[in-house]
Amino acid sequence: MERDDCRRFQDSPAQTTERRVKYKPKKKRAKDDDDEKVVSKHPNFRGVRMRQWGKWVSEIREPKKKSRIWLGTFSTAEMAARAHDVAALAIKGGSAHLNFPELAYHLPRPASADPKDIQAAAAAAAAAVAIDMDVETSSPSPSPTVTETSSPAMIALSDDAFSDLPDLLLNVNHNIDGFWDSFPYEEPFLSQSY
């Protein structure tokens, strides 16, 4: 009788079914709509990421190595993307995936495949973007004050960033006299007079 109970117990469907545990990957936390808007505001470029404080950095991995070439920190994503394009062309050649493939022939080329030369060429490309951005942000129509007889020195002087600052030294001479008057004048102590 005991055997029949054991057999019945073993043959019962509750005991014969295996308990299978499926691996379920952890779900990513659902982002709020506000977070998605913030993420989608800045462009995504290959080899470019944004720091928490708003600066953009660019780096590229050296082929067949785990190390990376640091290309720099930039104020805009476009500058960092152009720096990455220069490095990608230098390292991978024509098979490189570029952020701006239409501008490949305008980009500076490094003197060699040395990381220092690649960094220098990347910095030059980023600086060219900064110059292009300055030209675009300036007035689109030519300035009426600049004439053909203006010398290049006068144009450079008018474009000087410091020319827009207020004259901070205007009243310095008037205030300096009052500054020295606030100190009491005393004769120096000489030990020989005693």
UniProtKB/Swiss-Prot annotation:
Q: Give the record's keywords alphabetically.
A: Activator, DNA-binding, Ethylene signaling pathway, Nucleus, Transcription, Transcription regulation
Chain residue ranges for the region called Disordered: 1-40
Query: What biological processes does GO assign it?
Result: ethylene-activated signaling pathway; plant-type secondary cell wall biogenesis
Taken from the UniProt record, the cysteine pairs bridged by disulfide bonds within this chain are: none
DNA-binding stretch(es), residue numbering of this chain: 44-101
Q: What is its main location?
A: nucleus
What InterPro entries would the database entry show?
Answer: AP2/ERF_dom, AP2/ERF_dom_sf, AP2/ERF_TF_ERF_subfamily, DNA-bd_dom_sf
Give GO terms: molecular function aspect only. DNA-binding transcription factor activity; transcription cis-regulatory region binding
Segments traversing the membrane:
none
| Composition skew (Basic and acidic residues), residue ranges | 1-10
- Intracellular or extracellular location(s): Nucleus
Of the GO CC terms on this record, one is: nucleus
PANTHER family reported for this sequence: ETHYLENE-RESPONSIVE TRANSCRIPTION FACTOR ERF038, ETHYLENE-RESPONSIVE TRANSCRIPTION FACTOR ERF042-RELATED
Q: Which family does it belong to?
A: Belongs to the AP2/ERF transcription factor family. ERF subfamily.
Protein name from the UniProt record:
Ethylene-responsive transcription factor ERF038
